[in-house]
């Protein structure tokens, strides 16, 4: 059963594309609107506000792209390029960038909405016995502090994933789910994070996963590198709060730092409950100050990993620091139906063979 699950994950994450391509050489990929969450900060880490679309330059594999929509914080997206213009001859997909059919539910200009879809993933493994109530308090305060435009889902994990509260604007439902969690069992962080990211991909607009972890992963079969790449390709930013001192968990620290940086998020290492609250407050501020940029990729024969670079234009702006995801892998058409049309179950998920 474990072998079957690994084969499923291999297909799910697109790791077997090379083998499949040998059997069917006419594999195409889907490239629709690419959305970026971009943080701009000064040397002191303070957010730079009031920037315009013309202040940003976006490159994909070194190819200059045209910004299609632009928004700051939770403001509605401003249409910078009309759909007909963005999808004209300059941006019409080549053979390797076939557009999705309506059934594939592509991200479009009209699908971008204000606010973020925030998935909170809470560690309820046996690592969490100490400080469990303080962690619940910090999460509850975070939920109450998010802007009204944001929607929230609350999941918890130990060996399995529990979808305690589906994505909703109802804060009371989320708070009830937070208070109803109990601690116990081992921790399969990367298995459950993969499933959470997959759920997030079913929704339009900005997508964020906030992980609260109190210990290392000791049960997953999914490597963190695969989770990070899937999140990058899906445009899901990952934020991680670990209650373990970075010095005590050097391996986990490196993994958390790399995963969050690759997806445009951040990692925090909290030594006490006050640090936990400060970390959640920092994430809340980040969500409120992110710039959202989108573009239709120009023809690009590269069906593999595509590097994304975002720069600020103008000598007066080059001193600022940019944080966003650094690339993505176009989605194979043969997997698009499963990934884009599946809806998350509301029950617990226990992967076979774990």
Q: Where in this protein do the model-derived segments appear?
A:
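Bacterial N-terminal signal peptides
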Residues: 7-18
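Positively charged n-region of N-terminal signal peptides that target proteins for export
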Residues: 1-7
